């Protein structure tokens, strides 16, 4: 699972989900990518599930890059606990994703297999995504 090794503060405020991505919105490493179309918190489990979906479909060959990292903790108090008495424990780690962000990149010789693998990975994510190609970028 993807979690930070060490953080300065264990509990943080929730990040803002408004606006568009300022960086990371172009394919830099691979030939194909998954781009977010709406804001979302993507957990470490969802990232891992999408990565496994890509690797299972392509079997051998190619390379996958994960461009997001879940560096923000989300806390939650237990069910049935009254208000007050401090912030709850860390429940999960999330990556704050804004529209336009490239989430995954991939290089693979066969275009049809690569696009199908990215489509399957996009179904594991909690936001609307689209598949982009490097040559389509301007």
Curated annotation (Swiss-Prot):
PROSITE patterns linked: RIBOSOMAL_L16_1, RIBOSOMAL_L16_2
Q: Which UniProt keywords apply?
A: Ribonucleoprotein, Ribosomal protein, RNA-binding, rRNA-binding, tRNA-binding
- Record's compositionally biased regions (Basic residues): 1-19
Which residue ranges are recorded for the region named Disordered? 1-24
Give GO cellular component annotations, separated by semicolons.
Answer: cytosolic large ribosomal subunit
Q: Is Ribosomal protein a UniProt keyword of this protein?
A: yes
Q: Which GO terms are recorded in the biological process aspect for this UniProt protein?
A: translation
Per its UniProt record, what Pfam families does this chain match? Ribosomal_L16
Entry GO MF terms? rRNA binding; structural constituent of ribosome; tRNA binding
| Entry keyword annotation includes Ribosomal protein | yes
Superkingdom classification of source: Bacteria
What does the sequence similarity comment in the record state about its family?
Belongs to the universal ribosomal protein uL16 family.
The record describes the protein's role as: Binds 23S rRNA and is also seen to make contacts with the A and possibly P site tRNAs.
Please give the PANTHER family that the UniProt record associates with this protein.
50S/60S RIBOSOMAL PROTEIN L16, LARGE RIBOSOMAL SUBUNIT PROTEIN UL16M
Q: Subunit info? A: Part of the 50S ribosomal subunit.
Put simply, this protein is called Large ribosomal subunit protein uL16
């Amino acid at each position: 699972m993807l979690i930070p090794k060490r953080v300065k503060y264990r509990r943080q405020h929730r990040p803002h989900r408004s606006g568009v991505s300022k960086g990371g919105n172009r394919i830099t490493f691979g030939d194909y990518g998954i781009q977010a179309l709406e804001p979302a918190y993507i957990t470490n489990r969802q990232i891992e599930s999408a990565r496994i979906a890509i690797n299972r479909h392509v079997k051998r060959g190619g390379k996958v890059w994960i461009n997001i990292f879940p560096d923000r903790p989300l806390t939650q108090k237990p069910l049935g606990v009254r208000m007050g008495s401090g912030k709850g424990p860390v429940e999960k780690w999330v990556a704050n994703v804004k529209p336009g962000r490239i989430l995954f990149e991939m290089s693979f010789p066969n275009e049809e297999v690569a696009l199908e693998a990215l489509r399957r990975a996009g179904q594991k994510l909690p936001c609307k995504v689209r598949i982009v190609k490097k040559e389509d970028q301007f």
